[in-house]
């Protein structure tokens, strides 16, 4: 690859440092972008993504509006390396049936995804403790390959007769056998289990039977290792999806990246992961994700609108893990946080003109005007459909 030199915009003040990231390693320190809607975040993200693609890097871009995905796709010359995922162009991402992972690793990944889904959509997120227990036992009990999917898991959580059938496939007297034998027996603890299972199933039922069905039923079709090794581009357009579907799909992909960082070896090629409106993938583990991904040559670029969207402790942990910060026009609270960092007044931040931003790369602060979008209007084209020769993966769990 030729020399890496990502310019973020035009220099507004000649006394400031040139707004350039001149080392690919600095991208693995991650980038945080904040600003009100319509101030230029999307244009900056599109510029950064296009640069990385032209540098032949593997890229994942998660876009809740879909417009940026379309503009980026339109600007890519070699579309053979692009996978465009949308409600009209689904790809199966089955966290219950992935090749090359131990069952405990799959359990961990899926529970992280459900944690975020339940936390963002439930008034009782504390129930996730019991949820972890139930999901872990369920995934470790499923033996038939055709049952390793969310559709069957949902039935298992809802119907006692399905649990009895599953118990019959287990070794009598084993811990898993005893767990399901006691699950539906009378008792306050068991009542809580059944109630929790039904709450989780209600969310999974919507996913496994609604608009997301084509994303979750079948053999897993997305391998992050393959995407990185082949330097492919994954554009994820979550527009036209309901909120739960958007949360679930975004987290499926982000926490697949976490599993890639933790368990896949070696990490030869870099991967850039862009998440616009990243509050829908935030969890207590997110700071760990940023810290671990750095050593795996994975750089995250996270954008959102205001602090109210993310719990304070998680936001603070994110600030401690990013090497580049970009602040467009923002509210008073956000301006108060960033003004001392950039060495300016709060009014300088919440009065920034459109497409202007303060940038901190390492320890250098710069006021910039971001580059104008190369494609202003959203292209009108038929959303690409993934071909049938998509590389399917195996469906074996590794014994432990």
Task: Please give the residue ranges for each predicted region.
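C-terminal regions of RecA-like/P-loop NTPase motor modules
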Residues: 1-4, 307-400
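Alpha-helix capping and helix-coil boundary motifs
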Residues: 19, 98-109, 149, 380-400
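Conserved H-loop
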Residues: 64, 298, 303-309
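P-loop NTPase motor domains
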Residues: 2-17, 24-26, 31-298, 314, ...
